[in-house]
Amino acid sequence: MADVVVGIQWGDEGKGKIVDRIAKDYDFVVRYQGGHNAGHTIVHKGVKHSLHLMPSGVLYPQCKNIISSAVVVSIKDLCEEISAFEDLENRLFISDRAHVILPYHAKKDAFKEKSQNIGTTKKGIGPCYEDKMARSGIRMGDLLDDKILEERLNAHFKAIEPFKEAYDLGENYEKDLREYFKTHAPKICPFIKDTTSMLIEANQKGEKILLEGAQGTLLDIDLGTYPFVTSSNTTSASACVSTGLNPKAINEVIGITKAYSTRVGNGPFPSEDTTPMGDHLRTKGAEFGTTTKRPRRCGWLDLVALKYACTLNGCTQLALMKLDVLDGIDAIKVCVAYERKGERLEAFPSDLKDCAPIYQTFKGWEKSAGVRKLDDLEPNAREYIRFIEKEVGVKIRLISTSPEREDTIFL
C-alpha cells in the first residue's frame, strides 16, 4: 500500500520534515511531480539539508528513493545533489519516462516571465512541461541510447531554430548542449530505470511506499489560483498518474499545512498580512524560499482554502506545521470565509479577485516551541488546534513545534 504526503496550501508547508520524520517506516520514498523549482529543507542531527529533486528518504539508508515520471529533471542540478550523498547505488532510481529540462527551457522561461509576471522561478519548469505536452521533449530513457538521443537533439535543434535569437541561445548552442549531455549524462544514467514496473511490483509484494509531492494544492495547474500556478498537477491524484499505481493502492493521504499561510511570488492571497505582523511571521518562521531565497508573503490561516484542498486530495489526516511561529502573539486570526461584493463566500471560488477575508480571532499562547506532548501545550494552543480540526473535518495527527525532527507531537 502507498501513502501520499501532499501540501494543502501554496507550497512550502513543511512536507520535507514530515517525510523525513516518517520515512524510516517505508521501503520506498517517491517524488511524484514538479522539478528543481521546489525545495525541501530538512534538519537532521543539527545539519540543514536542502533538497530540490532528491526524495526526502535519502537520509535513511534502508529507503529506496524514486524520481517518478511526472517530475521534470535538470540533470546538472541532480548531479550536484547526488554528489552530496554517498552510497546511492540501489537507493536512487530515476524514471526513464521523466522529462529532461534543457538550458533552452530556462532561457524561454525567463523570456516569458518578463511579459507574464507570474512569479516563476525561471528554472525552465513550465517550458519543459510545454514540450512534454507537445510530444517533443527529451526523456531520461533517451539518455541510455546515443542514437536515440542524437535523434531527439536534432529534432530539438530544428524546432527551436526560429527562436534562437529571441531566447539568446548563442551561436554555439548546439555544440554546448551536446557537451552538456556528455558532461552530466554519464553520472545520471546508472540511476535510470523503469520505475513504473518497480513500484507496481513493490505494491503487489506489499512493500510500503511513501509518495511525496512538491509545491501545494493551490498551485495546481487545473485546480489552483490560475494563472498564478505551477505547471504540474500538485494534488494527490497526480501521485497515481506519475507512478503507475492505481487509486486502489492509496491508503492514507496526509495533508500538510502550516499554522498560518505563506505564498511565494505573485497571485491572490486573501489572508495576507501586509502589516508588521506579516514581517514578524516571515522573520520568526524563516520564510524565505529554499530554491530562490525570495521572501515569502505571510498571513493568517485560510480555512476556506484549507477545506477546499482537503476535499480535493481526499485527506485522511493532517500535519500542522510551525505552530511555534505563532508563540507570543496576543491575538491570532483565522480566515473562516470571504466577502466579495457584499456576498459571503464559504466555498473556494475559481477566481479570488476581490475576495476579502472574514476573520475569527483567538487568544494566543506564550510558548509551544519544543513541545512533544499534546497535554504540554497551553490551553489556547489546544483550542486553536481543535477549531481547525472541527472546521476542516479532518483529524490532525501530527504537530510540528520546531524545525528539529524530534520536536513533533504525534496524536
Swiss-Prot record:
Enzyme class at the top of the EC tree: ligase
Matches recorded under PROSITE patterns: ADENYLOSUCCIN_SYN_1 (PS01266), ADENYLOSUCCIN_SYN_2 (PS00513)
Pathway: Purine metabolism; AMP biosynthesis via de novo pathway; AMP from IMP: step 1/2
Cofactors: Mg(2+)
Pfam families on file: Adenylsucc_synt (PF00709)
Residues holding Mg(2+): 12, 39
Matching Gene3D superfamilies: Adenylosuccinate Synthetase, subunit A, domain 1, Adenylosuccinate Synthetase, subunit A, domain 2, Adenylosuccinate Synthetase, subunit A, domain 3
EC nos: 6.3.4.4
Protein location: Cytoplasm
Assembly and binders: Homodimer.
Function statement: Plays an important role in the de novo pathway of purine nucleotide biosynthesis. Catalyzes the first committed step in the biosynthesis of AMP from IMP.
Protein name (Swiss-Prot/TrEMBL): Adenylosuccinate synthetase
Protein's organism: Helicobacter pylori (strain Shi470)
Gene: purA
